Amino acid sequence: SIPAAAVSQGAAEALVAAAEDGEPARLVTDAHTEQARTRTVLAELPGSADGQVIMLGAHLDSVIDGPGINDNGSGVAALLEIARALGGTRPQATVRMAFWSGEELGLHGSMRYVATLAQSEKDAILVYANVDMIASPNGFAGVYDEPGAAVGSATASELLGAAVTRNGGTPVQVNLHG
């Protein structure tokens, strides 16, 4: 494994200059690490059709240097508002909301969740929408579609893009790989 650490802009520039001069780099850290147990919270509104799940998710944690209100308090607030709006309804597909733990440190909550699902449970998920950082004043109406994603992802991206357009926005397709 290759160790990594966050450094200041000045330290980064000094490291780059040293590397360009052929000097070896040395990184000394004084860090404390510990194992911690976290919890992912799942909420579900049962639908009338068996074997159909629409899934929405938002992560509960934030980066150490961020206030968390946008990343990702805004996504969590949106899911709670969606849950409130759906209260008392009976949708066709089951609506499952996941409030993920450990996202900023490596997608731990969502990766663990998916790893514990039986294939039939995975197959029942029609679409998953991740709600993250939606309150940024510098935001944009973006639709991320991963190449090679599950069947139906392209259709979901098209539908989300159409919804953005209907609401007066211009959806931006974002390439996650370059």
Model segments located where?
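Metal-dependent peptidase/peptidase-like ectodomains
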Residues: 2-14, 51, 64, 90-91, ...
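Alpha-helix N-cap and loop-to-helix initiation/capping positions
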Residues: 70-74, 148-151
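Short amphipathic alpha-helical face segments that pack within enzyme cores
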Residues: 73-81, 108, 112
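A structural signal for isolated positions on well-ordered beta-strands in alpha/beta enzyme cores
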Residues: 96-98
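Soluble metallo-hydrolase cores and metallopeptidase-like ectodomains found primarily
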Residues: 2-69, 81-88, 92-94
